[in-house]
Amino acid sequence: MADAPKEGRLTRFLDFTQLTDMASESVGGKILFATDDFFAPAENLIKSDSPCFKEREYTEFGKWMDGWETRRKRIPGHDWCVLRLGIQGVIRAFDVDVSYFTGDYAPRMSIQAANLEEEKLPEIPERGIRTGAAATPEEFEAIAELKSDDWSYLVPMTELKPGNPASGHNYFLVNSQQRWTHIRLNIFPDGGIARLRVLGTGQKDWTATDPKEHADLVAIAFGGVCVGFSSAKFGHPNNIIGVGGAKSMADGWETARRLDRPPILENDDNGILLVPGCEWAVFRLAHPGVITRIEIDTKYFKGNAPDSCKVDGCVLTTQEEEDMIKQKWILPAHKWKPLLPVTKLSPNQSHLFDSLTLELQDVITHARLTIVPDGGVSRLRLRGFPSSICLLRPREKPMMKFSVGFKANP
């Protein structure tokens, strides 16, 4: 998930909580090429954590900096790098972060992009350890096959300011609905940039999807996104639809402890806690479809997993979603259809729920995960078939039937 702009200049145009950093190393972003990495390698641009400064830290090549920093150029040209997005899709904005680069920041930059077919890409040499090095003639020859000079400009050449707290972040809106896979960052003529955040939403090519294979319809890499939640004290719900498995408890969704819990807790006859409150998160699916398998993973949440959960689904238009966001998701009960009834959860465990009868499932556009009374979840997977396939199936019953299985995490 993307952090909100610190200066607040774009908050009236974009809801940054609905965007993800498509270039981050945490989602599979990768630096393919850089003209120079003398002081600090370009891989630092796509680190998921915020840049830091170590006043007394030096390397054999000079001052240690948490970003990409090239040598002072003494030959014709300018520096640039190429990266492959970990999440490919629609770019809404860039954050060019020059934090801590106050006397050696890149004075100007521009950004280009391309939509390339993976199977047609040339072989690019692995970069390895780059500090103190410049690109070799062989690397220049390989990257030239991408013809990145001709890529579309999403940000023209623009001046940057020093990386002081008030001017470190430089935000640029992108007015394009095109799908992008690769980025070229140009700096003029040289210097340093701490981070490049490519903010947007994933976009899967559903026409290329095998209709016989399940797809995770809520995956952030395909375009799924959290559009509402009750609490996100220790982690945003977008984390639980992230790429791959959770890396730690910080990589999940965790709420604050509810204060309306009874002084003494009791269970019902099914072993479910009797409490008045709950927490919830609503997700827009990457593609409308039928859900046939649900996975709820509480890995790493050993003393703070929810007691129970349920999952509901509904069909909403874009306008209805906008209205619900304004109303904080106070949605009439009849709109939600149960996908998974109230179910007991266990700590640090993956819980699998498989549909018994696909033909009886309904198409949904949104899903709501409710946890009781509070706690944390590391991953949510909603696997099924996109609506272009499942709309051809009978839809007699709204209720989905599940068999419950548990797969313990090590």
Curated annotation (Swiss-Prot):
InterPro entries: Allantoicase, Allantoicase_dom, Galactose-bd-like_sf. Belongs to the allantoicase family. PANTHER family: ALLANTOICASE (PTHR12045), INACTIVE ALLANTOICASE-RELATED (PTHR12045:SF3). The gene is ALLC. It comes from the Eukaryota. The function of this enzyme is unclear as allantoicase activity is not known to exist in mammals. This is Probable inactive allantoicase. GO terms for molecular function: allantoicase activity. It comes from Macaca fascicularis. GO terms for biological process: allantoin catabolic process.
